[in-house]
Amino acid sequence: MKKTRRILLYGFGPYRQFRDNITAKIIKSLAPRPGLKKVILPVRFHRGQFVNTLERSKPEIVLGLGQSSRRGVDVEAQAANRRRAHPADPPKRISPRGPARIKTTLALKVGRVAGKSRNAGDYVCNFSMYVMLDHIRRHDLRILYGFIHIPYDYEKKKASGLVTKILGRCQRINLKAQR
């Protein structure tokens, strides 16, 4: 019998001019499944909320979802050590002594449905990625981490289908081969 993977799926609530966040809608629309922990976090630069979510969930795999203003779905390849609350502000480092970039560790293959991005921006999506990946790295945790940006105006049913498909693939991942 196959072991059920512990998967943390997180997204975000409303922010700035957006009263709704497509990631919250997607997460709420997904049926419960064994091993899946679904979390919707507030959009804020608060390291503790991300670290605490990781520690409480004890996942084997983390899949983060972020809303974007891009034209298509993007799988993020790395997080950058930079953040800023407003586009006019100069960027600040997330971790003064941390690496400039940290690569994601979950190989997400979604075909032509999504592009590959090496720039997660410098807002809370990137912040969450960097904080979680840095925590995983510094504590030598055996957790695979991936992140997907979804356009705010993307069709919810289509996006939910994509996330459902990815979660199914996550259940079938050979964790030893991925690490």
Task: Annotate each PLM feature.
Residues 1-123, 132-145, 151, 156-179:
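N-terminal catalytic or cofactor-binding beta/alpha core of small enzyme domains
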